[in-house]
Amino acid sequence: MATCEEVPEALKGQLDVARGLENLPVSAWPPGAEPEPFQYTPDHVAGPGADADPSQITFPGCACLKTPCLPGTCSCLRHENNYDDRSCLRDIGSEAKCTEPVFECNVLCQCSERCRNRVVQWGLQFHLQVFKTDHKGWGLRTLDFIPKGRFVCEYAGEVLGISEVQRRVQLQTIHDSNYIIAIREHVYNGQVMETFVDPASIGNIGRFLNHSCEPNLLMIPVRIDSMVPKLALFAARDILPEEELSYDYSGRFLNLMHSEDKERLDNGKLRKPCYCGARSCAAFLPYDSSLYCPTEKPDTSEEGRA
């Protein structure tokens, strides 16, 4: 079970970017600097065109009242334990972890709050800081050591319908950052479940994460109370204090992609430069052509996730 750690003396009195809505305060650097205003939310909120309200409870709970939640007996554990005894995501980066859904126990479950299958729902467990980078605007870094597999933060914001996504993208200029992310999950019957999240105006600290071609975070959809997944970011390796946190905007990192998803990411003509500095840097940020209306081609004022 999560507990709020004591705030380090050096962080006391500093701006809390999270406005007191997270387990731990999120400081900003340099002192006196403050990111552009936005409405903070630690969780998804329903936006225009959303197919489902992420705040509604749609999953039944397990009946593990007197026994621990284990695969085969707990309805929330479909295949195997999601986390180990240290609250680390099991087999992170493996093909199985990228293809099997992750369900945590929820508010209707009869198991204890100390259940090992409750991790993402407890929020921030490490001190994070929003900071000004040299070439990428604002970024997010950790002030603590983060072991491989531990949950770091969510990417939370407005859950949108595709028409609203395309409308918002069309209004962007080449100089605007696009925070909208499209998550596509290929289910057993060949269908694709799409989730669109935009934290530009309403979101959490995940909006400050920059792209890297060799990131230290991996995004995994995690479901708790609703079919709308939480976009949970886990440490793909051990992360040292003051390291910038990043993930791969394209979803390619440690993940198998379907051919149609690769095509969506490769069709873009206009690309923003990538400043991640990785040895395998692709030189340009990923571009998702599906965010544009299929009947229209983006002109010089439009760009994908950046």
Swiss-Prot record:
One of its GO terms (cellular component) is nucleus. S-adenosyl-L-methionine binds at K136, G137, W138, Y179, R207, N210, H211. Zn(2+) 3 binds at C69, C105, C111, C115. The keyword Oxidoreductase does not apply. Residues 270-286 form the Post-SET domain. It is found in: Nucleus; Chromosome. Zn(2+) 1 binds at C62, C64, C69, C74. Residues 60-123 form the Pre-SET domain. One of its GO terms (biological process) is methylation. Zn(2+) 2 binds at C62, C76, C105, C109. CDD domains: SET_SETMAR (cd10544). Its main location: nucleus. SUPFAM superfamilies: SET domain. Signal peptide: none annotated. It catalyses: L-lysyl(36)-[histone H3] + 2 S-adenosyl-L-methionine = N(6),N(6)-dimethyl-L-lysyl(36)-[histone H3] + 2 S-adenosyl-L-homocysteine + 2 H(+). GO terms for molecular function: double-stranded DNA binding; histone H3K36 dimethyltransferase activity; histone H3K4 methyltransferase activity; histone methyltransferase activity; zinc ion binding. It comes from the Eukaryota. Zn(2+) 4 binds at C213, C274, C276, C281. In the pre-SET domain, Cys residues bind 3 zinc ions that are arranged in a triangular cluster; some of these Cys residues contribute to the binding of two zinc ions within the cluster. Belongs to the class V-like SAM-binding methyltransferase superfamily. Histone methyltransferase that methylates 'Lys-4' and 'Lys-36' of histone H3, 2 specific tags for epigenetic transcriptional activation. Specifically mediates dimethylation of H3 'Lys-36'. This is Histone-lysine N-methyltransferase SETMAR. It comes from Bos taurus.
